[in-house]
């Protein structure tokens, strides 16, 4: 089974944790000084926030798989569709060790597809990144970061809805 993933940048982690805990009706499954994550079952989502990265907003979207086989299936589908992907293999990021790759949609939004292998005690275990990359939400400095998902804080005069 797969799980939808969202990672957002926040300025104030404690305030955001309080908000999302109330919204989800659940406490985070992991909390660190710069990061929190909820593994919600209904709807099935891995929702993460961190103080790392650029301006507040959605950093990237993703699909987390429960098995290595599901990740292989997603990767095969992407390759069959001639999608350019960056396979970073096994990597450590966001307090977890995962096998992952990245895609960027036609609008420039980054998508992470990954299978979590286990938890780690630090945000990332990779070598120090170049200037500007050290605070990125996702530790794969060479990943196609795409552009942030712009979500208006105040409604515009003319709004669209799904």
Ranges and model annotations:
Residues 13, 62-110, 118-121:
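Vicinal oxygen chelate
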Residues 1-14, 44, 61, 122-162:
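N-terminal beta-strand motif that seeds the catalytic metal site of vicinal oxygen chelate
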Residues 1-2, 7-46:
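Core segments of cupin and vicinal oxygen chelate
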Residues 32-35, 55-57, 94-99:
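Short acidic/glycine-enriched loop/turn segments that link adjacent beta-strands
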Residues 5-7, 37, 60-62, 100-102:
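Short aromatic/hydrophobic contact patches that present stacked aromatics
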Residues 44-48, 109-110:
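Short, charged/polar, Gly/Pro-enriched secondary-structure boundary elements
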Residues 27, 46-49, 84-89:
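A short linear hydrophobic-aromatic micro-motif
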């Amino acid at each position: 089974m797969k799980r939808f993933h969202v990672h957002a940048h926040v300025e104030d982690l404690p305030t955001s944790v309080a908000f999302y805990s109330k919204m989800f009706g659940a406490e985070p499954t992991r909390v660190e000084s710069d990061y929190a994550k909820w593994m919600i079952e209904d709807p099935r989502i891995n929702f993460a926030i961190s103080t790392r990265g650029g301006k507040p907003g959605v950093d990237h979207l993703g699909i987390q798989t429960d098995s290595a086989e599901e990740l292989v299936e997603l990767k095969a589908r992407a390759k069959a569709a001639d999608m350019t992907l960056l396979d970073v293999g096994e990597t450590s990021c966001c307090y977890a060790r995962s096998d992952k790759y990245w895609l960027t949609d036609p609008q420039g939004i980054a998508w992470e597809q990954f299978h979590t292998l286990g938890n780690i005690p630090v945000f990332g275990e990779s070598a120090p990144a170049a200037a500007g990359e050290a605070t990125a939400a996702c530790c794969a400095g060479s990943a196609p970061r795409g552009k942030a998902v712009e979500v208006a804080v105040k409604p515009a005069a003319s709004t669209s809805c799904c």
